[in-house]
């Protein structure tokens, strides 16, 4: 049996990311055999991961990667903001963002992609490995990508913890033959606008018919309450619909940076200034945890439950 020294425990900890006491126990159980200890930790870790997988993961990070005419964004969730500040977790999200770019935003292709330095593990398997080593439930929640033949895909990260990692990530695609550096500058400003204004659609044509009919019905009922003639009511509804578009459609929104120009006009003017038409190629906005229902815990009940065990 090999002597279980502090150096051996430290080495195992560095290789696995497991806690010091867990590493010491693993070496004791395997008579100091490091490879066997790694396997022992993995087995124990995976068993623990299965229990953790049921817990709500609504914290974490949004990661972004861009490469000229293409860009990708991914959301990886964890249970606590503490883990989001962990170097290992941040490194994982950075790597996954780059892999998302290669996978063109396809979440299934991303999950099955080989994880660099992961000893043959896929990205999905690496998530399970991290659950075991870091000790929290994690989830590769969603991914998306944008690409243009000519132009740029640029990004903006709000509340960034480091470049490309943060809470709100935005991609904006601009199609144009104009100078890429100038386009990138414009795209970043529009991406900042998207982060703040939260549009749901790029163009009016993208607003789904059901949402539009529902909005028109609500506005019509509101207008009828005024008791005005039908012709006036119709004009009131159309006016309010324009307001609705300004709230949810990016090209119809007022640019937050100047507070007076519609995004469509901003693009039109920039195209004239740069000597080439500029067309919006789309946008993606990921906000960490949006749509996830967080668990409301009753601390007293949790303590009582633990005392009964």
Curated annotation (Swiss-Prot):
On the tree of life, the source organism's domain of life is Bacteria
| Gene3D superfamilies assigned to the protein according to its UniProt record, in alphabetical order | 1.10.286.20, DNA helicase RuvA subunit, C-terminal domain (1.10.8.10), Elongation factor Ts, dimerisation domain (3.30.479.20)
Provide one Gene Ontology cellular component: cytoplasm
Q: Where in the cell is it found?
A: Cytoplasm
Keywords on this record?
A: Cytoplasm, Elongation factor, Protein biosynthesis
Main localization of the protein?
A: cytoplasm
Mention any Pfam family matching this sequence. EF_TS
Write out the ranges of the annotated region (Involved in Mg(2+) ion dislocation from EF-Tu). Answer: 80-83
- Keyword Ribonucleoprotein listed? The answer is no
Which molecular function terms from Gene Ontology are attached?
translation elongation factor activity
Q: What family does the database annotate?
A: Belongs to the EF-Ts family.
Q: What is the stated purpose of this protein? A: Associates with the EF-Tu.GDP complex and induces the exchange of GDP to GTP. It remains bound to the aminoacyl-tRNA.EF-Tu.GTP complex up to the GTP hydrolysis stage on the ribosome.
Record-given protein name: Elongation factor Ts
State the organism of origin: Rhodospirillum rubrum (strain ATCC 11170 / ATH 1.1.1 / DSM 467 / LMG 4362 / NCIMB 8255 / S1)
